[in-house]
């Protein structure tokens, strides 16, 4: 049995429009900041169980942020994914963060790109772990569950509130049977995800995250899917910040080709393939993700001389094999 990671701080901020935004902090207080965006579904406790040890060892302050409609974040559907950057601007201002790296798991990936686009002089680098690709316009990728949801985007728009309440009710009903539900989900998952779920602390982390994330509302899941099927408000082609992708080559939810597709659109992107892993395999690479992002931090020893606002390079994708934590 493992132990879920314990936040150094667990709280909320108030935005200028009166909404609340939930967040948690892990790792080194006062260290270089990494903002972590959870998956879909997910909340602020969805993070590697080793986050404190890995972040402390590297002097990193990890801040996990809940999107509107989950945990302690007030329900709110932004018009576009890009509008999430306004919430992050206020959060970082209130927490005293100027420059930062960002990382996002699965559904958190598009929000990483949005912030990198919005703050090219503040975001030093970004990581996308099994991230969702655009579904609209010339940047769209084919296949995957989000592409399927795109076919139903009109009813999703109309039914988002009742669907959110339905998911919330289902989560509340299942929580007393969390252990049993987890084991059923584990057995029906691909081998790569089963290995992740069996790692020390993963089960406890996921159960805690769903429990605390669904206490008040659980609408963020539906809001995310609705936003994924809209125009994002920007193109990955215009993201000048270095972005690194981690993606399992057996991902059954977001195909590996999606990671390569989005990376191929960007001026400075690389893909780290995770052989034999599925959708959640990149959670096991959290230490590697930290090391790569810190290596791109311009003011750190041994970091490259280029800055996030450097002139655009010729678009390229380089594939490397992931090595775990």
Give residue ranges: language-model regions.
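Conserved acidic catalytic loop of the alpha/beta-hydrolase fold
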Residues: 83-101
């Amino acid at each position: 049995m493992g132990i879920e990671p314990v936040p150094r701080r667990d709280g909320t901020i108030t935005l200028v429009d009166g909404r609340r935004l939930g967040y948690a902090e892990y790792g080194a207080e006062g260290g270089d900041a990494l903002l972590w965006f959870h998956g879909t579904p997910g909340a602020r406790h969805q993070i590697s169980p080793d986050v404190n040890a890995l972040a402390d060892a590297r002097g990193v302050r990890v801040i996990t942020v809940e999107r509107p409609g989950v945990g302690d974040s007030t329900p709110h559907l932004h018009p576009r994914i890009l509008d999430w950057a306004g919430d992050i601007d206020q959060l970082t201002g209130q927490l005293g963060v100027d420059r930062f790296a960002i990382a996002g798991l699965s559904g958190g990936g598009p929000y990483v790109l949005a912030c990198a686009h919005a703050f090219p002089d503040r975001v030093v680098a970004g990581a996308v772990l099994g991230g969702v690709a655009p579904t609209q316009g010339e940047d769209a990728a084919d296949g995957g569950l989000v592409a399927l949801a795109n076919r139903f985007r009109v009813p999703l728009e109309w039914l988002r509130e009742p669907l959110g309440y339905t998911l919330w009710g289902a989560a509340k009903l299942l929580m007393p049977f969390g252990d049993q539900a987890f084991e059923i989900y584990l057995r029906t998952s691909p081998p790569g995800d089963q290995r992740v779920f069996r790692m020390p602390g993963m089960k406890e982390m996921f159960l805690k995250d769903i429990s605390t994330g669904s206490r008040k509302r659980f609408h963020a899941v539906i809001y995310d899917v609705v936003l994924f099927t809209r125009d994002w408000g920007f193109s990955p082609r215009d993201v000048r910040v270095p972005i690194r992708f981690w993606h399992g080559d057996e991902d059954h939810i977001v195909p590996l080709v999606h990671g390569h597709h989005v990376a191929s659109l960007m001026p400075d992107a690389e893909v780290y393939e995770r052989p034999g892993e599925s959708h959640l395999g990149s959670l096991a690479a959290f230490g590697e993700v930290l090391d790569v992002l810190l290596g791109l931090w311009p003011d750190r020893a041994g970091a490259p001389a280029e800055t996030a606002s450097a002139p655009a390079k010729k678009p390229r994708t380089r594939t490397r094999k992931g090595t775990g934590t």
